[in-house]
């Protein structure tokens, strides 16, 4: 899980999801998981 100020899709499988006011990126590749913070 990477914590970044700006989350972006890295590949086409990445999905941007907003959970409880936190923007997250979910992907089939675990290295692409990100959270805004």
Curated annotation (Swiss-Prot):
GO CC, any one term: ribosome
UniProt-listed GO biological process terms: translation
UniProt keyword annotation of Ribosomal protein present: yes
Domain of life: Bacteria
Gene Ontology molecular function, alphabetical: structural constituent of ribosome
Cross-referenced PROSITE patterns: RIBOSOMAL_L36
Keywords recorded for this protein, A-Z: Ribonucleoprotein, Ribosomal protein
InterPro entries: Ribosomal_bL36, Ribosomal_bL36_sp
Family of this protein: Belongs to the bacterial ribosomal protein bL36 family.
This protein's name: Large ribosomal subunit protein bL36
Species, as recorded: Actinobacillus succinogenes (strain ATCC 55618 / DSM 22257 / CCUG 43843 / 130Z)
């Amino acid at each position: 899980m990477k914590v970044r100020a700006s989350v972006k899709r890295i590949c086409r499988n990445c999905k941007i999801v907003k959970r409880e006011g936190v923007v997250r990126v979910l992907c089939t590749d675990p290295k692409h998981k990100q959270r805004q913070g």
